[in-house]
C-alpha cells in the first residue's frame, strides 16, 4: 500500500489526518499556514483522494502499520475527528515515532453507550449508516452540515467543506463503511493514561457533532495534555480559523 501524501514546507515533520468522508484538500489552508515552520504531510486516508481506489485498509491495526511505515520515523501528528482517534491509537502503538499530538474536534469514543454520554446516540448513528448505504452523496452532505452547524461562520465553513469534497473526490469502495466501523468500534478511554506524548486538544465550543465535553474528557485523561476551547467554532474549527489554529500549534510546540 502506498499512501497519497501532499507535502509542503520545511522544518519538523507534521502529519495531518482528516476525518470521515473528507479528504486531504480540507487541510489546504492550515497546511499553508504551517508550512513556514513545519514540513507538513497532509495524508489521504486509505480510500480517499484522487487515486482513492488504489489504497485500502481493512483494520485499525493495518492502517496504523501503513502510516508508521510510509511517514517519517519521527513526527508530530495532528488529527481531526476520526483522524484524531487514529492519531491517538498510532501514538499509543508507536511512541518512538509520534512525538506530539494535536487533536482537533476529537474524542476517545464517537458513539454513546451506557457509560459514555459524550457521543452520538446509537440510534442516530445507525440511522446515519443506513443513509450512507442508501445514498453516500446525500449522507455526506448531511455530515458536512453537522460539521458546520453551530459555527459562527457556518455558511462559509459548509461552502469550504463542500469545495474540498468536490475537488478531492469521493471515497472509493469500502472506505466509507470502513470509516463508519472505526467510528462505531474505537474506544480509547482505557488507553489514554498510557499516551504520554505532549498533546494539544482543541475543541469548538459549539461543536454539533462531537460534544465539547468529549474534548474536555480527553484533556483531563491524557497525562500531558493542554486544552484549548475555541469560542464560536463548530466541529470544523480549523477551516476558517487556520491562522489561529496554526499559531496555537506553534505556541504549544514551543512549550514542549
Stretch-by-stretch model annotation:
Residues 79-83, 87:
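Gly/Ala-rich beta-loop-alpha elbow adjacent to hydrolase catalytic centers
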Residues 133-186, 190-191:
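Conserved alpha/beta-hydrolase catalytic His-Asp/Glu region
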Residues 92-93, 98-133, 175:
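Flexible "cap/lid" loop of the alpha/beta hydrolase fold
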Residues 233-246:
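Catalytic histidine-centered segment of alpha/beta-hydrolase-like enzymes
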Residues 195, 201-203, 207:
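Short beta-strand/loop motif that positions the catalytic acidic residue
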Residues 208-214:
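Conserved alpha/beta-hydrolase "acid-adjacent" motif
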Residues 61-75:
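Conserved acidic catalytic loop of the alpha/beta-hydrolase fold
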Residues 2-53, 60:
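Conserved HGGG/HGGXW glycine-rich cap/lid loop of the alpha/beta-hydrolase fold
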Amino acid at each position: 500500500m502506498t499512501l497519497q501524501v501532499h507535502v509542503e514546507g520545511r522544518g519538523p515533520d507534521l502529519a495531518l489526518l482528516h476525518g470521515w468522508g473528507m479528504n486531504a484538500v480540507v487541510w489546504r489552508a492550515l497546511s499553508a499556514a504551517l508550512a513556514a515552520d513545519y514540513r507538513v504531510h497532509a495524508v489521504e486516508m486509505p480510500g480517499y483522494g484522487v487515486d482513492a481506489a488504489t489504497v485500502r485498509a481493512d483494520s485499525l491495526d493495518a492502517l496504523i502499520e501503513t502510516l508508521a511505515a510510509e511517514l517519517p520515523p519521527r513526527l508530530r501528528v495532528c488529527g481531526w475527528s476520526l483522524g484524531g482517534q487514529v492519531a491517538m491509537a498510532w501514538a499509543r502503538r508507536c511512541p518512538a515515532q509520534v512525538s506530539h499530538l494535536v487533536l482537533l474536534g476529537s474524542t476517545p469514543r464517537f458513539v454513546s453507550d451506557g457509560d459514555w454520554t459524550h457521543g452520538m446516540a446509537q440510534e442516530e448513528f445507525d440511522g446515519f449508516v443506513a443513509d450512507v448505504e442508501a445514498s453516500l452523496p446525500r449522507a455526506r452532505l448531511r455530515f458536512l452540515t453537522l460539521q458546520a452547524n453551530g459555527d459562527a461562520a457556518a455558511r462559509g465553513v459548509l461552502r469550504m467543506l463542500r469545495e474540498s469534497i468536490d475537488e478531492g473526490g469521493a471515497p472509493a469502495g469500502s472506505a466509507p463503511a470502513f470509516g463508519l466501523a472505526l467510528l462505531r468500534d474505537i474506544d480509547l478511554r482505557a488507553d489514554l493514561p498510557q499516551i504520554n506524548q505532549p498533546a494539544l486538544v482543541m475543541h469548538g465550543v459549539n461543536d454539533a457533532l462531537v460534544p465539547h465535553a468529549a474534548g474536555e474528557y480527553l484533556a483531563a485523561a491524557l497525562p500531558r495534555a493542554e486544552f484549548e476551547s475555541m469560542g464560536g467554532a463548530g466541529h470544523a474549527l480549523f477551516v476558517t480559523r487556520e491562522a489561529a489554529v496554526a499559531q496555537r500549534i506553534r505556541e504549544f510546540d514551543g512549550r514542549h
